[in-house]
Amino acid sequence: MKNPILILFTAFIALLGFFGMSAEALADPKADPLAGPNPDADPEAINLKAIAPLAKKLLG
């Protein structure tokens, strides 16, 4: 039999991840799961559209 503390810890982490993702989905229900971060929902999200031209300019 495996260590019961390890099993309980793994189950706790799995539930924490599940409920954390559910809370994020509830916070922004219109968000497309395949799209990037929504800047309106997350003001600290990285603006990739603004970074892409700069990266192209730097990398050539």
Curated annotation (Swiss-Prot):
A GO term from the CC aspect: extracellular region
Residue numbers bearing the Leucine amide modification: 59
Compartment(s) where it occurs, according to its Swiss-Prot or TrEMBL record: Secreted
Reported tissue expression: Expressed by the venom gland.
Record's signal peptide: 1-27
UniProt AXPX repeat ranges: 27-30, 31-34, 35-38, 41-44
Keywords (A to Z) from UniProt: Amidation, Antibiotic, Antimicrobial, Fungicide, Immunity, Innate immunity, Repeat, Secreted, Signal
Biological role stated in the UniProt entry: The synthetic peptide shows antimicrobial activities against Gram-negative bacteria (but not against all strains tested), Gram-positive bacteria (not all strains tested) and the fungi C.albicans and C.parapsilosis. Exhibits little hemolytic activity against washed human erythrocytes.
Protein family according to the UniProt entry: Belongs to the MCD family. Mastoparan subfamily.
Name of protein: Mastoparan-VT4
High-level lineage: Eukaryota, Metazoa, Ecdysozoa, Arthropoda, Hexapoda
